[in-house]
Amino acid sequence: DELDRLPEGDAATGLTRERWISLVLADLGYGRVPPTPAGGLVAGEGAAAKSYPVSHLWGATPIHQLGWNVDLDRRTRGLAGAARAPHALVQELLNRTDDYLWAILTNGRSLRLLRDSTTLTGFAYVEFDLEAMFDGELYSEFALLYLLAHQSRVEVAEGQAPSTCWLERWRTTAIGQGVRALTLLRAGVESALETLGTGFLQHPANVDLRQRLADGTVRPTDVHA
């Protein structure tokens, strides 16, 4: 195993990209993903501009490719693209600009699909365990990865906003359906409570309760949490 022959502490970035990540991305339709210019990607303008050392960019989708031995949630001192926690780096980039809405972050072990989360208090992402997926031949997991992370899901037509990609359209539709489902569920719960409450009060054993409700001794709020 080539990874085992690397010196201790080697991030294995080049090996991981060439021998593994490039193959996974090719299977997902990205082909050879172009590297970003020196310094990475820039968010903001003028004095507010800030550079983010993200390694690659496919269309409007940053794809930060790191080595097998790089932790995605912790900084790796002295390593380009990981001098601060890679996940936090990519998330901040998405949050600071409208140029990118979705991004991919991977070290070969796992692949994360991130989205701009300025309206949320935490991170918004989906993670795929590539190591377990391929070692365990988990075809259903790969099918899900293919469904969500294929290049056609994040592809943006020339001159269009990142929000026009299929992945964002699906997200918008899912949110709308979820709101409608909650509205229907709320109405159903209210109807069920009214039916149960009416039946409870009409039961012959509850004559005393009906009388106490009628004369105000017991209020509806006393029996409804």
What is the role of each PLM region?
Residues 13-14, 34-35, 54-55, 64-67, ...:
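Residue-level signal for functionally critical sites in structured catalytic/ligand-binding pockets
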Residues 21, 28, 33, 56-58, ...:
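Generic detector of bulky aromatic hydrophobic side chains
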Residues 24, 28-59:
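Active-site metal-binding core of divalent-cation-utilizing nuclease and nuclease-like domains
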